[in-house]
C-alpha cells in the first residue's frame, strides 16, 4: 500500500526492511518555512562506519535520535563521537515517548552523561531536546508527550534554529 511505502521510504534495501535497521545512508528533502531541509538517514552501527562518515561529511547538523525506553546504545556513542569530531551541532530527539516503558527524563540524563564521558566541548552540550512519536509524526519541545494533534513542526523549527545554513556561493564553480 501507499502508506506502507511511505513508512519505509528511507529503508528501501531488502535487508534493511527485514532487519529493521539502516545500512545504507539515504537522503530526503522537506520544505519548511521557505527553507529546503535535506535529511540524511545514516546507519548507527560502527559496522557501517564508512556510510556514517560519508553522510556526516555532507551535513551541517545532526538529529541524535534515541529511543526513550532503551536509551543511548553503543551506536549512539559512535555516531556522536563522529559528529562532535566534525563540529556538528546536535538536536537530541527522544523518540517513542509513548511506549509504556519509556523513561525520557532518565534517558536524557544518560545522554548528558554520554556527552560528558566523551568530553564534548561545552558548546555542544547546549542542545535542544525534542520528544517524539515519530511513527505518528508527532513532536514537542523538551521532555514530554506530544499532543494527539501535534505535528513535526517543533522538530523542523529546531533544525532551522540550530543548524546553520551552508556557507558558499552557489554560482561559484565547483
Residue ranges: model-predicted function:
Residues 45-46, 97, 135-139:
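A short, flexible beta-alpha/helix-coil linker loop
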Amino acid at each position: 500500500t501507499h502508506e506502507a511505502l511511505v513508512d519505509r521510504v528511507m529503508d528501501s534495501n531488502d535487508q534493511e526492511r527485514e532487519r529493521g535497521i539502516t545500512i545504507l545512508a539515504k537522503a530526503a528533502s522537506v520544505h519548511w518555512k521557505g527553507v529546503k531541509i535535506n535529511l540524511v538517514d545514516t546507519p548507527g552501527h560502527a559496522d557501517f562506519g564508512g556510510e556514517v562518515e560519508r553522510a556526516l561529511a555532507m551535513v551541517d547538523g545532526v538529529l541524535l535520535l534515541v529511543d526513550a525506553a532503551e536509551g543511548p546504545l553503543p551506536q549512539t556513542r559512535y555516531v556522536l563521537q563522529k559528529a562532535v569530531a566534525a563540529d556538528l551541532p546536535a538536536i537530541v530527539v527522544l523518540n517513542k515517548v509513548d511506549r509504556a516503558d519509556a523513561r525520557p527524563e532518565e534517558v536524557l540524563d544518560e545522554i548528558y552523561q554520554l556527552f560528558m564521558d566523551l568530553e564534548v566541548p561545552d558548546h555542544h552540550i547546549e542542545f535542544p531536546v525534542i520528544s517524539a512519536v515519530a511513527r505518528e509524526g508527532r513532536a514537542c519541545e523538551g521532555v514530554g508527550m506530544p499532543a494527539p494533534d501535534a505535528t513535526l513542526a517543533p522538530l523542523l523549527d529546531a533544525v532551522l534554529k540550530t543548524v546553520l545554513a551552508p556557507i558558499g556561493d552557489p554560482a561559484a564553480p565547483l
